[in-house]
Curated annotation (Swiss-Prot):
The modification Phosphoserine is found at residues 260, 273, 307, 646. One of its GO terms (cellular component) is cytoplasm. Residues 21-63 form the CUE domain. Residues 298-324, 337-358 have a biased composition (Acidic residues). PROSITE patterns: CUE. Recruits the ubiquitination machinery to RNA polymerase II for polyubiquitination, removal and degradation, when the transcription-coupled repair (TCR) factor RAD26 fails to efficiently displace stalled RNA polymerase II. Also involved in telomere length regulation. Binds DNA. It is found in: Cytoplasm; Nucleus; Chromosome, Telomere. This is RNA polymerase II degradation factor 1.
Length: 738
């Protein structure tokens, strides 16, 4: 044997170089073939990589253990001969564990393990591979060839679980080498293994008798079709073996096996054709049942006759009660049916099993031609019941379906006027209520209903209500400190107002942004109403007015944060010069979540903020493809060009910006239905009229400038793709793409 030679080569160093992969293979193999030591397996594992091929070789006997050869004692020889005589016809049958697909009605002995039966007891390892694909077998009977002992092997059907079949196999089915005439010498090698196996089997049988007593008495009086002549042997003394996995599977099939000789293959073939006919019958009967059920849908209260063999009558009535009653009746009747059939079969053993197989699952029929004992016959009809049950509920439900849409439509109609009412109420409340109270109601409407008719309205939609109180205090302080360009008023602003603004901003932040943190789609910010950047706009605006530190928000303000805010921020932090070069601003600590407020790690918000371009967050100025072209360039303007400082605007204008905000808000509140007195009385003190004039003039001037800038940008940028030099993120033309 070449394996012997190889063994002597490898064995010396094999133990040293067992890498974990080999070791795991060897472990699984030793579990499958306990009588192989790891030394025996090492060579095979080294020679063949694939576990399946190794198992194949061992089970087919192409590879054997290097073992002592003993001559069989006379007694053993005599026993074997007797056995072989009694079993001669069975050589035409497959040893179920040997033939992978159970197909061979032809000579499957070409690779039965019995030639090298040192490995014979684990042929089922082969099964283990194939259990997932059970075939419709040409030979349905699996006959287990054990010395005079009946070990029912487990039929592999689609309904038994893979684990169940395998575990049953590996634990119990130990095919003995009974069906080879010619290999007596080789058989002698495995006698020790056989004796061990037989002892094991006896122990296991004793353990399992407790489990199987129930099945036993059902099996006793049912010798199966082919055992007409040898009914003297029943399987009562050897109950079916089941592993825990088999017991756990939903329908343990206790299928009785006989080991009596089958006279010829022709008989088998006849049986198989019978069974195919039965399949067709059962299918046809199921179809009839379905047809009847559909007709029963039209005449609901009449009774249809749905049953496997059209014997039972299940009255159909509306409602869910029908289903339950029908299920119960069917189960009861089927149990009675199967019991009757089994009695009939016991009377005439030779009768073919058509009646039972009609009720059985088709899978079971093709897999095993043996009678099901009672408990199987009871469990098998369940799938068919299940197939009928879904059809039964359809009958009462169908007439109801047309009603359901009507019901759905009715509630919808009242809802719509309700919504309109709510909107009207909200609109009526706006002029009446104080702004702090109106804030929440107006939020949604501000986003979607207000037009940007004025340049600053675009940026200040919601701010007008929410920050009014702050701005009032701010304006009041401006009057106390008449020098309009001083930075003190803002930094001295009362902490209370700062707190209010922060609360509002936080509330709004959570209201919109956190719902769908990473969600974006390309045109998302096209509509002015979309509340994405507005949150930051408020946050930063708040900071710009309440404290001087808003410079930090210069590049982190989200998309809506526009020039006016940052201009004010630059002014208040006395950083106008510094902020003119973006690099200093990056160095500021980040106080907001980096990518536009809702952190999405992938591609840095590919659509919203396309990472390298818009907001270089990380303080390295030279790293990005181009630098920020403008001082307060914010990537994604949700509002059309608000107050973008064109390069020629000086710091003087920046300083005026900060004041301009209040006046603009006050002016815009009038068209939006905010009563004028409320605006003019800020905390009980009237607005300085001179201030208001100043604001108005500047507002007009800046609007002109901006229209010009926007027109230029639109002309220049028409059709230029995204990353290029003059790209103006404030202009509407460029907005949808990136």
């Amino acid at each position: 044997m070449s394996t012997q030679f190889r063994k002597s080569n490898h064995n010396s160093h094999s133990s040293k170089k067992l890498n974990p992969a080999l070791k795991s293979k060897i472990d699984t193999l030793t579990e499958l073939f306990p009588d192989w030591t790891s030394d025996d397996l090492i060579d095979i594992v080294q020679e063949y990589d694939d576990l399946e091929t190794i198992i194949d070789k061992i089970t087919s006997g192409a590879v054997t253990r290097w073992d002592e050869v003993k001559k069989p004692a006379k007694k053993e020889k005599y026993e074997k001969k007797e056995q072989q005589h009694s079993y001669v016809p069975q050589q035409h049958l497959p040893n179920p564990e040997d033939d992978i697909t159970y197909k061979s009605s032809n000579n499957s002995n070409s690779f039965t393990s019995t030639k090298h039966n040192s490995s014979n007891n684990y042929t089922q390892a082969r099964n283990k591979k194939k259990v997932q694909t059970p075939r419709a077998h040409t030979t349905g009977k699996h006959v287990n060839l054990d010395k005079g002992k009946h070990v029912p092997s487990k039929p592999v059907s689609n309904t038994t679980s893979w684990a169940a079949a395998v575990s049953v196999d590996t634990k119990h089915d130990v095919p003995q080498d009974s069906n080879d005439n010619n290999n007596e010498e080789l058989e002698a090698q495995g006698q020790q293994a056989q004796e061990k196996n037989q002892e094991k089997e006896q122990e296991e049988q004793q353990q399992q008798e407790g489990h199987n007593n129930k099945e036993e008495h059902k099996q006793i009086e049912q010798p199966s079709l082919s055992s007409k002549k040898t009914t003297s042997r029943t399987s009562a003394s050897q109950p079916k073996k089941m592993s825990w996995a088999a017991i756990a599977t939903p329908k343990p099939k206790a299928v009785k096996k006989t080991e009596s000789p089958l006279e010829n293959v022709a008989e088998l073939k006849k049986e198989i054709s019978d069974i195919k006919k039965d399949d067709q019958k059962s299918e046809a009967s199921e179809e009839k049942v379905n047809e009847q059920e559909t007709s029963a849908q039209e005449q609901e209260e009449e009774t249809a006759e749905p049953s496997e063999e059209n014997e039972d009558r299940v009255p159909e009535v509306d409602g869910e009660e029908v289903q339950e009653e029908a299920e119960k009746k069917e189960q009861v009747k089927e149990e009675e049916q199967t019991a009757e059939e089994l009695e009939q079969e016991q009377d005439n053993v030779a009768a073919p099993e058509e009646e039972v197989t009609v009720v059985e699952e088709k899978v079971e029929i093709s897999a095993v031609i043996s009678e099901p004992p009672e408990d199987q016959a009871n469990t098998v009809p369940q799938p068919q019941q299940q197939s009928q049950q879904p059809q039964q509920p359809q009958q009462p439900q169908q007439p109801q379906q047309p009603q359901q849409p009507q019901q759905q439509q009715q509630p919808q109609q009242p809802q719509q006027p309700q919504q309109q009412l709510q909107q009207q109420q909200q609109q009526q409340q706006q002029p009446v209520q104080a702004q702090a109270q109106a804030q929440e109601e107006q939020l949604s409407q501000n986003y979607y209903t207000q037009q940007q008719q004025q340049q600053y309205a675009q940026q200040q939609h919601q701010l007008q209500q929410q920050y009014l109180s702050q701005q009032q205090q701010y304006a009041q302080q401006q009057q106390q400190h008449p020098q309009p360009q001083s930075q003190q008023p803002q930094s001295q602003q009362s902490p209370q107002s700062q707190k209010q603004g922060n609360n509002v901003a936080a509330q709004q932040y959570y209201m919109y942004q956190n719902q769908f943190p990473g969600y974006s789609y390309p045109g998302m910010f096209d509509s002015q109403g979309y509340a994405y950047g507005q949150q930051y706009q408020q946050l930063a605006q708040n900071n710009a007015q309440t404290s001087g530190n808003a410079n930090q928000y210069n590049f982190q303000q989200g998309y809506g944060q526009a020039g006016a805010n940052t201009a004010a921020a630059n002014l208040t932090s006395a950083a106008a010069a510094a902020a003119a070069s973006p690099a200093t601003a990056h160095a500021q600590p980040q106080q907001q979540q980096p990518y536009g407020g809702s952190f999405m790690p992938y591609y840095a918000h590919f659509y919203q903020q396309s990472f390298p371009y818009g907001q270089p967050q990380y303080g390295v100025a030279g790293q990005y493809p181009y630098q920020l072209p403008k001082n307060n360039y914010n990537y994604y303007q949700t509002q059309n060009g608000q107050e973008q400082q064109s390069p020629n605007q000086g710091v003087a204008q920046h300083s005026e910006d900060s004041q301009q905000k209040q006046s603009q808000q006050q002016q815009q509140q009038q068209p939006q239905g905010q009563p004028q007195p409320e605006v003019q009385m800020q905390n009980g003190q009237p607005v300085n009229p001179q201030q208001q004039m100043q604001f108005q003039q500047y507002y007009q001037f800046q609007q002109q400038q901006q229209q010009a800038a926007a027109a230029a940008a639109a002309a220049a940028q028409q059709g230029v793709p995204y990353g290029y030099n003059g790209y103006d993120y404030n202009s509407k033309n460029s907005r949808g793409f990136y």
